[in-house]
Design a protein with these regions (language model features):
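A glycine/proline-hinged amphipathic helix-loop "lid/cap" segment
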Residues: 1-69, 296
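Proline/glycine-enriched tight loop/beta-turn segments at coil->beta junctions
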Residues: 60-62, 69-77, 225-227
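Short amphipathic alpha-helix adjacent to the substrate-entry channel of hydrolases
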Residues: 92-111
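Alpha/beta-hydrolase active-site loop
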Residues: 120-140, 287
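Gly/Ser-rich "nucleophile elbow"/oxyanion-hole loop immediately N-terminal to the catalytic nucleophile
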Residues: 137-152
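Hydrolase active-site cap/lid region
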Residues: 167-216
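Short beta-strand/loop motif that positions the catalytic acidic residue
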Residues: 232-234
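Catalytic active-site module of serine/aspartate enzymes centered on a nucleophile-bearing elbow/loop
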Residues: 277-296
């Protein structure tokens, strides 16, 4: 029997269960995902500025949102890719998470409304985050951002997008850090954590198979050499936990600076739940400390 944090248990007892998204019409599934996440944004912390931006791309303007913890000029900037199985989510569903990350790191956070699968499978989302990095380094936010102190971050599917962006972008030398929260990096479904937590702990193995079918991303890890210092975390009760632990080993094996935290008693997506869950707040603090130190 796996231990569940008391606050996590209370959330699970009171929160509406997520439906089988893969069995709903896509528009209905996306609207439902948005409603389920809206609760966690009701207590978004106040910041000095939250500004919407349009990022020009060859395929049209892309919405983005800049979170500034202070109005001090030339602050470091973290480009953030939201989770949602590459199929769901937006800069609105993850507003609270991005605001807290900005506060805890004392850095700007730029959230990106990348194109979603299945309409736009791999590599569309990676192209979009690369375009956001290009734009912010190119001065889109004016003097709010120091283009020489950049980082990438993301949760779940967004962690995979951020990792692939790091190995793809020509701005790799500008990246001081990465923060990857409970990511899905390979289409593997036979790990011990999938066996233990693939049913009954929120995210299911069946849904992950569906997400990967929408995304159609790479089935091998990219070249991981010479990446910036990387912070990773995982909930203990997550079917994706072993993917994170395997990535930690792969990063370390090629000489990267890697930090890992595993949070007991919580499930996939727990950082969205900061309003009611102390381990989520602790995870934001830990990630913020890491990013703040690396972005000095």
């Amino acid at each position: 029997m796996s231990w569940v944090h008391p606050e996590m248990a209370a959330i699970l007892a009171s929160a509406p269960l997520a439906p089988d998204f893969q069995r709903l019409p896509l528009a209905e599934a996306r609207a439902t995902f948005g409603r389920l996440n809206a609760t966690w944004n009701e207590s978004t912390p106040a910041l000095a500025e939250i500004r919407d931006l349009d990022i020009p791309t060859p395929w049209g303007a892309m919405a983005a949102r800049l979170f500034r913890p202070s109005l001090a000029p030339r602050r470091p900037c973290i480009v953030f890719a939201h989770g949602g199985g590459w199929t769901f989510g937006s800069i609105e569903t993850h507003r609270g998470t991005m605001a807290r990350l900005a506060l805890e790191s004392d850095a700007c956070v730029l959230g990106v409304d990348y194109r979603l699968a299945p309409e736009c499978p791999f590599p569309a989302a990676v192209e979009d985050v690369c375009a956001a990095l290009d734009a912010i380094i190119g001065g889109l936010a004016g003097d709010a951002v120091d283009p020489y102190r950049m980082a990438l971050a993301g949760d779940s599917a967004g962690a995979a997008i951020s990792l692939l962006t790091a190995v793809s972008t020509p701005w790799k030398p500008r990246l001081r850090a990465m923060a990857l929260f409970y990511g899905c990096y390979l289409p593997v479904f036979d790990t011990a954590s999938h066996g233990a937590y693939g049913i009954g702990f929120g995210l299911t193995t069946e849904r992950m198979r569906w997400y990967w079918g929408n995304w159609r991303g790479p089935d091998t890890l990219p070249d991981l050499t010479e990446l910036p210092p990387t912070y990773l975390n995982s909930p203990a009760l997550d079917p994706l936990r072993d993917e994170t632990l395997d990535l930690v080993r792969a990063l370390a094996d090629v000489g990267n600076d890697v930090t890992i935290d595993v949070y007991a008693g919580v499930i996939h997506g727990f950082m969205q739940m900061s309003a009611k869950l102390e381990p989520a707040r602790a995870a934001h603090r830990a990630a913020g400390r890491f990013l703040s130190e690396k972005l000095k």
